[in-house]
Amino acid sequence: MEKLGMNEIREKFLSFFESKGHLRLPSFSLIPKNDKSLLLINSGMAPLKPYFTGKETPPSKRVTTCQRCIRTPDIERVGKTARHGTFFEMLGNFSFGDYFKKEAIPWAWEFVTEVLGLPVNRLWVSIYEEDDEAFEIWNKIVGLPPERIVRMGKEDNFWEIGTGPCGPSSEIYFDRGEEKGCGKPTCGVGCDCDRFIEFWNLVFTQFNKDEQGNYHRLPNPNIDTGMGLERIATIMQGVDSIFDVDVIRGITNFVSQIAEVEYGKDAEKDVSLRVITDHIRGITFMISDGILPSNEGRGYVLRRLLRRAARHGKLLGINDTFLYRVVDSVVENYGEAYPEIIDRKDYIKRIVKLEEERFKETIDQGLTILQDYINELKVQGKTVLEGSKAFKLYDTYGFPLDLTKEILQEAGITVDEEGYTKELEKQRIRARSSRKEDNSLWEQDIYSTLGDIKTKFVGYDTYESNSKVLAIVKDEELVEEAEAGDDVSIILDVTPFYAESGGQIGDNGILENENVLIKVKDCKKVGDRFIHIGTIERGLISVRDEVKAQIDVVSRRNAARNHTATHLLHKALKEILGDHVHQAGSLVADDRLRFDFSHYQAVTKEELKQIENRVNEKIYQSLNVHIEEKTYDEAVKEGAVALFTEKYGDKVRVVKIDDYSMELCGGTHVKNTNEIGIFKIVSESAVGAGLRRIEALTGLAAIKYLEEKEEILKEASDLLKAQDKEIVSKIESLQQVLKTKDKEIEQLKIKMASILANSLINSAISLDGIKVVVSKVEDYDSEALKALGDILKDKLKTAAIVLASSTPEKAIFVGMATKDVVQKGINMGAVIKEVCKVSEGNGGGRPDMAQGTGKNPSKVEEALNKAIDIVKEQLKN
């Protein structure tokens, strides 16, 4: 058989199924769209789920894709085995109620034997033990001998997750030869050894499983197949590991050059090389798809991969930041198949380098502390690290728990994960959000039971429509009618209401006829159904009733102003900050807009001014807004901006602002930029690593904001008795005066503290040659008490000091001791702990310095008497 590279196999697969009437779709983003059950896309089928469930209409009944995927459950095994990886590509052909087994099986066989040229005598298949139909097709139509068709049980050859669509599967195996086997007489398809490699899974979704566990035949069964590109490449190239495949090996070699080590010479170093090679691929595509490092959700997965790869770089002796350089190799090897990473290369490298530098600042210190923990545990003969210590490594040094666990595992130590979790909750630190898949992958919500009900949206052209009620949902149940006071969700056949999407809020308004008035507060979309959410103000509404649907026109126009302004802002950001800027999220409301975007540092005052001026310049130029429908490919070729996180059909809506801006967008817009009136930025802030946020106002909201600012300016001018232009210099002058006064006050405090210290020294008692000062001081906080204690220590040279103060709510205690006194047995941590207990509080610290508070300030004197007793006792012992 011919040796084929990954890029060749990918293209051959997609071209083959195109020849069978399939629509080739580009890989979807790793960020799932409208799917809370998934953190990241982890299979070829995952982004197509809405088509399988009927929530959305597929662009074709036959589809083929090569989908990039991320899976991290086996992250600890990556690099240690030949097959495990977190990033992979899944080839697939799919049928949505079109063809079934009679086509899917022969096509699969045709591809592997005729296109790939795999030898027939080395191919085996497995089927579900009760699937006689699949057996007949493999045997009679394909011509595979019965002995090469292995029947297997539900665990191996039946696909189901919770309830919903499911069905038997058939898998194709490649026999790598006896020399790769385990040598057991029972060795065959399904054996755990490396001889028989499963590389293509054909799933026949022909049943629907109900909550009672019963299976019902689907009227229109589906086909869902998946073939791991890396795995079939190992077969085609005759190699044992995915890390020896051409494209992936190219990245490994690049890392080897940086590390100055040769791959294949040292088992431990090879593990690190493979970890880096795997992780940098996922890192590159995650950042390209708009994910940024953070401490939760997808961002946490990315940070975890980055820091794990960085640590393995350190194990290879690479002490400088280097991962950002490896991005070049990923782009070189994958850019042909995924040209978007070529365009985003500089941005990806910048984010990787920033995160590397952030981790580099703390990793050495963190590793030293972790090694100390390991040494302590070994001395103590223990094998479990306290959860609080693992948390400290995470909180202070940025070590994800998994990284700590992995390093400890190498030393035969585990982590008290329960204790770690408790620390997270106690400290109110947001932990990584490992969203688990729902019991049902298919999200059988109320709206998915409505069959072919669809809503026609007419809101681009009109603000009202005569509509029919198709369904009413009340208390999460479908009902035939609802009455005044009920909160309802209503689906209409036709609507002018814009449903929340693309960052733009849903319309509000009313539904009414002579019998009913419903105040609609929001409108959302589930598949092709528009859900009008509101409250019945009067009357009764029933399914099939006719109503007039009217939106709040003022609210819609304000949202349109903000949406068009958002497009102008996006373009202005790219022009002024650079092409690396990509939209990462937005909110288009009727009273404001918010825009999140990728940028590696705070936007300067001067840049913000330029951005605001650029947007207003385009508003005043009265640019026309043109809206057209085009094919996705046409729009992108013409330069339309598409968002990473959106999923587009074959036909797209293009919003073009003359020759200035062009984006794919389903939102509502003004007809001319002069309708926006004015654009005003009100804030710029960070929302994550490499992620910034601008909030802005337009139209009357912006004018009102400026009027409020003007009023504040006038009040300041009146108070300062200064002209507007003089306000800043007047404030600076006052600040200088205050600074001088503060210095004078500070000097007076020092003098007073010195006088007070002399007074306290005069009242000090002597115990075994040690001066002991125990006293209450009025109107001092803990910092002032510590400063006074330092003066006393300096003056007395050999001293034990306990000072207290109080407010109506609490008592404050500070204990201090000189080094020689500590050597004589004084421990202020123990003294303050007991003293605070007397006044119903808590405290503690080091032998030479401790502090605490008490809830009962009336017991300060009693507590101080206790302090003298404890000091005496400590000196005796």
From Swiss-Prot:
Recite the UniProt cofactor note for this protein: Binds 1 zinc ion per subunit.
Write down the InterPro entries for this protein, in alphabetical order. Answer: aa-tRNA-synth_II/BPL/LPL (IPR045864), Ala-tRNA-lgiase_IIc (IPR002318), Ala-tRNA-ligase_IIc_anticod-bd (IPR018162), Ala-tRNA-synth_IIc_core (IPR018165), Ala-tRNA-synth_IIc_N (IPR018164), Ala-tRNA_ligase (IPR050058), Ala_tRNA_ligase_euk/bac (IPR023033), DHHA1_dom (IPR003156)
Which keywords appear in this protein's UniProt record, sorted alphabetically?
A: Aminoacyl-tRNA synthetase, ATP-binding, Cytoplasm, Ligase, Metal-binding, Nucleotide-binding, Protein biosynthesis, RNA-binding, tRNA-binding, Zinc
Its primary localisation, in coarse terms, equals: cytoplasm
Q: Which Gene3D superfamilies match?
A: 2.40.30.130, 3.10.310.40, 3.30.54.20, 6.10.250.550, Bira Bifunctional Protein, Domain 2 (3.30.930.10), Threonyl-trna Synthetase, Chain A, domain 2 (3.30.980.10)
**Recorded GO MF terms:** alanine-tRNA ligase activity; aminoacyl-tRNA deacylase activity; ATP binding; catalytic activity, acting on a protein; transferase activity; tRNA binding; zinc ion binding
Sites where the protein binds Zn(2+) = 563, 567, 665, 669
Q: Mention any one GO cellular component term assigned to this protein in its UniProt record.
A: cytosol
Under the heading Pfam families, the entry gives: DHHA1, tRNA-synt_2c, tRNA_SAD
SUPFAM superfamilies for the chain: Class II aaRS and biotin synthetases, Putative anticodon-binding domain of alanyl-tRNA synthetase (AlaRS), ThrRS/AlaRS common domain, Translation proteins
Q: Does the keyword Lipoprotein apply?
A: no
Reactions performed catalytically: tRNA(Ala) + L-alanine + ATP = L-alanyl-tRNA(Ala) + AMP + diphosphate
Name the needed cofactors.
Zn(2+)
Q: Which GO terms describe its biological process?
A: alanyl-tRNA aminoacylation
The listed locations are: Cytoplasm
Its Enzyme Commission number(s) read 6.1.1.7
- Main function: Catalyzes the attachment of alanine to tRNA(Ala) in a two-step reaction: alanine is first activated by ATP to form Ala-AMP and then transferred to the acceptor end of tRNA(Ala). Also edits incorrectly charged Ser-tRNA(Ala) and Gly-tRNA(Ala) via its editing domain.
| Notes concerning its domains | Consists of three domains; the N-terminal catalytic domain, the editing domain and the C-terminal C-Ala domain. The editing domain removes incorrectly charged amino acids, while the C-Ala domain, along with tRNA(Ala), serves as a bridge to cooperatively bring together the editing and aminoacylation centers thus stimulating deacylation of misacylated tRNAs.
Belongs to which family?
A: Belongs to the class-II aminoacyl-tRNA synthetase family.
* Protein name according to UniProt: Alanine--tRNA ligase
Species of origin reads Thermoanaerobacter pseudethanolicus (strain ATCC 33223 / 39E)
